[in-house]
Regions:
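Repeat-unit-sized solenoid/scaffold elements
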Residues: 1-5, 80-83, 94-108, 134-149, ...
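Solvent-exposed edge beta-strands and adjacent loop segments
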Residues: 2-77, 125-143
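Serine/threonine-rich low-complexity intrinsically disordered regions
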Residues: 18, 43, 86, 172-173
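Structured, beta-strand-rich domain cores
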Residues: 55-57, 61-121
Length: 189
């Protein structure tokens, strides 16, 4: 049965992409996923002739938006954002000229019939927000947000190079059971 609706966000992971080897590291959990909101990027171009839209082209430039977490894990800050932990003092510090690494983002949406697992293959992130507030009569958690850009990455699929942006699978698909143990790539067209 197909889902009629989707809701929820869980099982959020990142997997660092090795630009030289063209491979992904093992996915690392990012617990505390609150919200994922990504807008499509791209343009629609219309060529007018004969008083009609004679030719229409649509570009797919991926997605951009926000991932909100209870707290951004320290592992993400070091693995992806380039923060460093001082071996003597234990201080974890941010370096102004650090170059964030590319990564795959894996996550799951629930549905009325089944969960659907998603992967964005080539993401870049900006530094997380830094904020908090005083405690009043009740404790109100303050979340952290990462701005994301997800674009295409060239991978071989069925013997041909294809610009992959994202993929998804449902429980009946072969990739589902091992989805969060390694970044799943399509094998054939």
């Amino acid at each position: 049965m197909a889902n009629k609706v989707k809701y929820g966000l869980s099982n959020c992971y990142y997997a660092v992409y090795d630009e030289t080897a063209g491979t992904y590291g093992t996915p690392v959990a990012m617990p505390g996923a609150v919200n994922l909101s990504l807008d499509q990027e791209g343009d629609t171009n219309k060529f007018r002739a004969d008083n009609i839209d004679y030719y229409v082209s649509i570009s797919n430039n991926g997605y951009s938006g926000d991932l909100e977490l209870a707290l951004v894990p320290d592992s993400f800050r070091t693995d992806v954002m380039g923060e460093t932990v001082d071996s003597t003092s234990g201080l974890q510090y941010e370096v102004a000229d650090a170059n964030p690494k590319a990564f795959a983002l894996l996550f799951q949406f629930e549905g009325d019939d089944h969960a659907t697992r998603h992967v964005l293959y080539y993401c870049k992130a900006s530094r997380p927000t830094l904020a908090s507030q005083t405690t009043e009569e009740t404790i109100e958690p303050v979340t952290e947000t990462i701005n994301l850009t997800a674009t295409a990455i060239i991978k071989t699929v069925g013997g041909a190079s294809k610009p992959l942006v994202k993929a998804k699978c449902k429980p009946t698909d072969t990739a589902y059971s091992t989805f969060f143990t390694a970044v799943q790539l399509p094998a054939a067209t």
